[in-house]
Amino acid sequence: MTLFSTRHLDMINVMTYDFHGSWDTITGENAPMYADSSETTELARGLNVKYNKTVSLVSLLLFDKATCIQNWLDKGAPASKINLGMGTYGRSFTLQSADNSGLGAPINGAGQAGPYTREAGTLGYNEICEQKGQWTEHWNDDQQVPYAVNGNQWVGYDNVKSIGIKSEYVKAKNLGGAMIWSVETDDFRGICGDKYPLLNAINSVLNGQSVRPAHNRSALFCILYFV
């Protein structure tokens, strides 16, 4: 049965990010493509059920893009109206100990604010790129996203590789497109390589071309939509 009528909706922008942040007690990825194996085990244990992909209550509590989108599809939302949300920023944490810096490490709270976003617990991809020499990047193979560590600072974010994987998922599921939050925290100066690398990674996969957004000083936040 359809969860609700989508007849009068042009599109459904699914905000599949902010799955973890400084409100948690441990480090976690901002926008994982897939669930972490330990996360699914802990949820199953807490619900007293054996985990499998057909347990709807467990899947509703999993914090990852693939499960989230599949829930929308299973409830009857048309794939052609669903846009997968992607973030051009990361969620950061201050570790309790720099010696324990993996996924699920205990934290003392939000990470240090960046010079532009100026919000503890958030770093734009552009800010991460500006400090790239200070960070040690790790690839989270389970969840298909990176995280980086700098002393007692930890950030889970997206890079060109993970954004490309998510864009391929959009194609594989025949979704309507993708949306990002938001263009001003992409690497618009090209410090990590080409300008707007995340934006262009999406567009390259979905449309086979790159884009160069025009600057608009009056617009602080922009959401871009791709079909």
Where are the language model's segments positioned?
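Acidic/aromatic/glycine-rich contiguous surface patches that form carbohydrate-binding/processing clefts
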Residues: 91-95, 99, 152, 159-222, ...
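Substrate-binding surface in catalytic domains of secreted glycosidases
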Residues: 1-128
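Residues that form generic nucleotide/phosphate-binding pockets
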Residues: 55, 131, 205
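Short flexible/disordered coil segments
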Residues: 46-53, 71, 149-157, 170, ...
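Hydrophobic, secondary-structure "cap" segments at the distal end of domains
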Residues: 114-175
